Amino acid sequence: MQNELDPFRELEFPADLPEKKKRLARIRRIAKGTYKGLSYISPIAGTLALALVGAGIYFGYPVYENYKNTDPMFDGYVAPRNPGEIVSIAQASTVTIECVLKNDEQTLGSGWAIDLKPSSSKYKSSIITNYHVLDDCFDSKGKLSVLDEDLKKYEMVIDILDKKNDLAKISSTIDLVPLNLAPYGPSPGYWVMTYGTADGWVGSVSFGSVMNNTETEIFITANTSHGNSGGPLLDNEGNVIGTNSWGMEGEQYNGAMSLDAMCLKILKCKYNKGKYYWA
């Protein structure tokens, strides 16, 4: 049975009760429980807590719902308000990249749309992927295609290859919504989401966090599998912070190439005070 002074217990109000009176009722209820509990520690602590609780609730910030006090836009450590929105953003911008070899063997990877100019007017979208997603089909060994979520095939052409950072830019006839690039780099503990064609399953999603990072690599706890390579690594606002690139057998982390790594050949970047700024 919940204590009547439990500050996490929501009150029931008549449907026609004004919002201002609801807030005042919450203040009275929480004030009793909060002040009584903290006053055992210090009368001053109880009084200060009472003032903060009252002000927060009255002005529309219900402290008993602590999650609402943290905005993902300004805090990379918290989960997004609506993870489904982040999944939808990725879904509209991520593709499967297929390499079919002459012996009919098939390899799959992923790619994500970026706001860069395609190589010619024939193509509608620019896409980032991994170098190793494409290299089985180099030298006319096979045919590369871009596949949408319904596995419809689209033409593509390779624009830029960066073997050192295992990255590539391609253009395709598929029409995609470009993903936004994160305005800042990640830090250990940041929330992340991977999206791609894990083990051939289109639209696979996993959540995790940044374990650590270097200038060019991001180590993540989110699960990835063969086929995730080239897909986007997203933050809690749906912005790209990296490109999923490799996994560690028997370890608890996987890896992505950061946006900074794209500055070598793909992005036009400025370097200032030890940091890259991409355009």
Model-derived regions, located:
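N-terminal Sec-pathway targeting helices
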Residues: 23-49
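Catalytic-histidine neighborhood of serine endopeptidases
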Residues: 59-71, 86, 108, 115-164
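Flexible, gly/ser-rich surface segments that form the specificity/activation loops bordering the active-site cleft
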Residues: 177-228, 244-255
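N-terminal targeting leaders characterized by basic, low-complexity, disordered sequences
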Residues: 1-27
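Active-site substrate-binding loop(s) of clan PA
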Residues: 85-86, 112-113, 117, 136-138, ...
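Catalytic nucleophile loop of clan PA
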Residues: 112, 224-244
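A short, Trp-centered hydrophobic/proline-enriched beta-strand micro-motif
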Residues: 88-104, 110, 192
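C-terminal cap/linker of serine protease catalytic domains
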Residues: 8-15, 59-60, 65-76, 81-87, ...
